[in-house]
C-alpha cells in the first residue's frame, strides 16, 4: 500500500512539472556555467521556483542532480522540501538557510537537513575539494527514503565565493542507478565555473 501511495504521489507531482532537454553550455542562476556533454533533462515545477536547477536522467524519483549558484547569505536552499511521505506526528519539513559565516564542514549539515526531509541521512565522508574554482568540500551520504524504503547514495560539492554559496548534489538508488549515472554527474561538475 505504501508503495502504491508513493507511486500515485510521484505521478501527480510529475504531472505538475515540465521537462526540457539540456545540452552544451548551461548557465545556472546567471552565476555559474557548466558544460553538458551527455544530455540531461531539466525539471521545472509549474508552481514553485526553487533556488536550484534540478536535472535528471531517468526521472526525479530515480536520480537527480541539483545545482545551486550564487545563493546569498540568509537565503533558504529550498522553498518546498521534497517530502514523499510523512507519518502522523512527524516534525515539519526543515528549510535550511545559508549563512556565509559557516565553516565548510557545517555547510554539509544544510544538505543533510534537505535530504532528511525525505528519510534518514547518514553523512559517510567529507573531504576538501575545489568546486567551480573555489575551495570547498565534497561529501558523500546515504539516504533511506521513507516513501518506498529505497536506499539512495549521494554525493555533494559546496563552496563559498564572495559570500555566495555554490553547490551541487547528486543522488540515486545505490544498487544500479548510482554507479551507472555518477560518472555523468561528475562530468558536469568538473566543468563548473563561477561567472564574473
Features from the language model and the residues they span:
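Proline-anchored loop/turn motifs at beta-strand termini and strand-loop-strand connectors
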Residues: 29-50
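Bacterial Sec signal peptide processing site at the extreme N-terminus
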Residues: 15-31
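Conserved polar/disulfide-associated segments of primarily extracytoplasmic proteins
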Residues: 48-153
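Short, well-structured beta-strand
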Residues: 122, 127-196
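Stable alpha-helical elements in mature extracytoplasmic
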Residues: 36, 103-107, 111, 181-188
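Sec-exported extracytoplasmic/periplasmic mature domains
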Residues: 41, 112, 116, 120, ...
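Soluble non-cytosolic domains of exported or imported proteins
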Residues: 31, 98-105, 175, 179, ...
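Sec-dependent bacterial lipoprotein signal peptides
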Residues: 1-16
Amino acid at each position: 500500500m505504501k508503495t502504491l501511495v508513493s507511486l500515485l504521489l510521484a505521478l501527480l507531482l510529475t504531472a505538475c512539472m515540465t521537462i526540457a532537454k539540456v545540452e552544451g553550455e548551461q548557465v545556472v542562476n546567471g552565476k555559474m556555467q557548466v558544460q553538458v556533454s551527455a544530455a540531461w533533462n531539466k525539471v521545472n515545477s509549474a508552481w514553485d521556483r526553487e533556488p536550484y536547477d534540478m536535472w535528471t536522467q531517468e526521472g526525479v524519483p530515480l536520480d537527480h542532480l541539483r545545482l545551486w549558484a550564487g545563493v546569498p547569505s540568509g537565503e533558504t536552499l529550498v522553498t518546498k522540501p521534497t517530502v514523499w511521505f510523512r507519518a502522523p506526528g512527524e516534525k515539519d519539513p526543515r528549510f535550511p538557510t545559508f549563512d556565509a559565516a559557516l565553516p565548510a564542514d557545517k555547510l554539509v549539515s544544510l544538505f543533510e537537513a534537505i535530504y532528511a526531509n525525505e528519510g534518514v541521512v547518514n553523512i559517510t565522508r567529507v573531504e576538501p575539494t575545489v568546486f567551480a574554482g573555489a575551495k570547498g568540500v565534497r561529501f558523500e551520504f546515504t539516504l533511506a527514503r521513507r516513501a518506498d524504503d529505497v536506499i539512495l547514495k549521494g554525493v555533494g560539492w559546496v563552496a563559498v565565493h564572495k559570500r555566495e554559496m555554490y553547490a551541487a548534489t547528486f543522488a540515486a538508488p545505490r544498487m544500479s542507478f548510482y554507479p551507472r549515472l555518477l560518472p555523468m554527474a561528475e562530468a558536469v561538475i568538473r566543468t563548473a565555473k563561477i561567472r564574473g
